[in-house]
Amino acid sequence: MDTISASKSGTQAKGDILAPSPVKVARVALVGVSGFADVHLKTIRRGVERGLLEFVAVTIINQEEEPEKCREIRELGAKIYGTFDEMIQGISGKVELCFIPTGIHLHAPMVISALEAGANVFVEKPAAATVQDVLEIKRVSERRGRFVAVGFQNLYDESIHWMKECILAGGIGELRSVKSMGLWPRTDRYYKRNSWAGQLRVGDDWMLDSPFNNAFAHQLNMICFLAGKTFEKPAELDSIEAELYRAREIDSPDTACMRIQSTGGVPLLFFSSHVSRELRDPVIVATGSQGEMVWEMDGVRHFDSNGVEIERRENRSWVSLRDRILAAVLKRISDPREFICGPEIALAHTISVNGAHESSTVHRIPEKYCSDYTREGEHWMAVDQIEEQISEAFDQDLLLSETGAVPWARRGKKFLLKGYKNFPAALNLRLFV
């Protein structure tokens, strides 16, 4: 398989995962080891085993719950701190890279603290909860001369690079639209896994948890990226119309659709739900005047205007992709040309998330359209016929309220995104009903 040129993406061949980097062995720190932070711990362990990383420090606030990981971390040579602030004081000026896989509401303050301590940062997606937070991260990053890489993992895969380069090169003609749809049912346990799941706020801090700011955040970010006029930049966003819904007893939406207009006139459509009975993995379709490209979980396909498949590229496996991300951020330490998903790219996603909440309150789906059921010992909730309703809207490039087939749908207002720099734009914003 051909690879993208290093001058653009800095990608490596799939058989060369975590090859020696031109940077010296990087000293790294980690925040947390539970939940998704365990993914980062495993990545760091592989990096240490391959001589790429020196594991210096980790924050573990629940050490009594993670005795085995604490033992393993000590064997790897890292110092364990009980709080993030203590760790930051201990590592100031001593690490090249800090991994921050924490709750969304903690991203901005932790990233900024790590930058001020002289570390580059890899933060899990999204970059932060609000547009003003992402802008502040960007300012501090530039002032401190340190980078921030955001964990929108698919943007580090060669297949998505190929997809965007093909679009930019006119491989599907003039780009007409980019859209995504995904249905991933979630159980009660999903919303009880931590203190912030399904929340719009945690105390005084914005959380804005939702399918499009968490599980399907990758796809929303990708459609913004794919519509960008240059490889390194996402689309510039002009306006958004969103529809946000909840079937569960939560504050945040569990179902959403939105239409985002780019300044270049290309519409971006997005559909997601956690309250379907069926699981339908996410798909992205970029349609042009002379064909289309389709991203799915296993790869990217290029079709001509007659629907004939021209070419296909596979996506990386999970472990391979996580190692590819590490290789990219390690190379970025010494080579500013190495492609990462930085705040400049991730900002479009956060603007879309914030704009969606400006456009629509979170409407309650009436109980008569919802069903509770138990499967494999887990409690689930589903909205009747939502698979067909969302699929029909997706196929027709319509929002749910525009199809005329969804009795509970409520249209949101058009909200302008150009020059949008603060969430919420109005102090009296009504978030849910």
Q: Can you name each region flagged by the protein language model?
A:
Residues 82, 123, 148-150, 295:
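Hydrophobic residues in well-ordered beta-strands that form the structural core
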Residues 36, 154-240, 246-249:
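Predominantly a Rossmann-like dinucleotide-binding segment in NAD(P)-dependent oxidoreductases
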Residues 10, 15, 207-208, 214-339, ...:
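Contiguous beta-strand/loop segments that form the cofactor/metal-binding neighborhood of enzyme cores
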Residues 78-140:
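Beta-loop-alpha module in the N-terminal Rossmann-like domain of NAD(P)-dependent dehydrogenases
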Residues 2-75, 430:
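N-terminal Rossmann-like dinucleotide-binding module
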Residues 136-154, 174-177:
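Rossmann-fold dehydrogenase core element
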